[in-house]
Amino acid sequence: MPHSLRIGTRASPLAVWQAEHVRAALLRLHPGMAVEIITMTTSGDVLLDAPLHALGGKGLFVKEIEDALQQRRVDVAVHSMKDVPALQPDGLEIVAIMAREDVRDAFVSNTFLHPDALPEGARVGSSSLRRRAQLLERYPHLRVEDLRGNVATRLRRLDEGHYDAIILAAAGLKRLGLPDRITHLLDIDRSLPAVGQGAIGIEARSDDRRTRELLAPLADADTQNCVLAERSMNQVLGGDCRLPVAALARWQGPQMLLRGLVATPDGRRVLHAEAKGSDPVALGMAVAAALVAQGAAEIIEDVRNA
């Protein structure tokens, strides 16, 4: 068993919280281990002047960390699973996904208690085409404007009056000790979450057997299988965190229900599909096929080329 481990993570407060969460879990299992957290800046952290969907490329929030992992500058990478592309680099694998936090999106406003109360032309901040599409489907009178930066930056922009409301992941606010900033939690029927939202993934080198064995007990089997189904759907669609694609898998007794969504960014066309099954990969492929049959591939291609 190794006596030390280096965890690579983004430098944002939320990413560091996630790495500390993994570190604490490891130390509960191995109290004598030295676990170092190494922070680094990713392309997604630097390129803040353009919407995510306009930046191109995949893995905007993970590539530099995965590079460090491949170059053996760190032993483990910790990610928010919604940032991890459907296909991973050769030689790397997600070896554990921890128990999931709240999967829902949070409506945050200093003025309005619910999105239903937002008036014509109200400005809502979000960096996500997925959130934009689902908001505009229900509330076409809103102005959904791009909002980038870490959680504190986004909240500050709201508090400075640049937006009437913003949409954030509930998990991030709760993990940062800011549940009081949540004005209203959006039901998944209103805002289906991103693939892997609320789940922390731990990545290691495929050939590093000892580290993989060390991390395996941190996995939550139910979460891991649900995220696997969501990512299976996303892989077939060729989606990533920049695209208007959503999915959520949940166990219902011995079977899993997977719901999937693909939408045009303006919310005028929103495709839904769902299926039940016990094989996460097959389930994801089935839901993806149902979405493709409705025209999902064309929507995704149009967004990529926009």
Curated annotation (Swiss-Prot):
Organism the protein comes from: Acidithiobacillus ferrooxidans (strain ATCC 23270 / DSM 14882 / CIP 104768 / NCIMB 8455)
Cofactor(s) listed in the protein's UniProt record: dipyrromethane
Protein name: Porphobilinogen deaminase
An example Gene Ontology molecular-function term: hydroxymethylbilane synthase activity
GO process annotations (BP): protoporphyrinogen IX biosynthetic process
Modified residues (S-(dipyrrolylmethanemethyl)cysteine): 241
Keyword Nuclease: no
Pathway this chain belongs to: Porphyrin-containing compound metabolism; protoporphyrin-IX biosynthesis; coproporphyrinogen-III from 5-aminolevulinate: step 2/4
Domain of life, source organism: Bacteria
UniProt cofactor note: Binds 1 dipyrromethane group covalently.
Keyword Transferase: yes
Family of the protein in this entry: Belongs to the HMBS family.
Subunit structure, as described in the record: Monomer.
Keywords: Porphyrin biosynthesis, Transferase
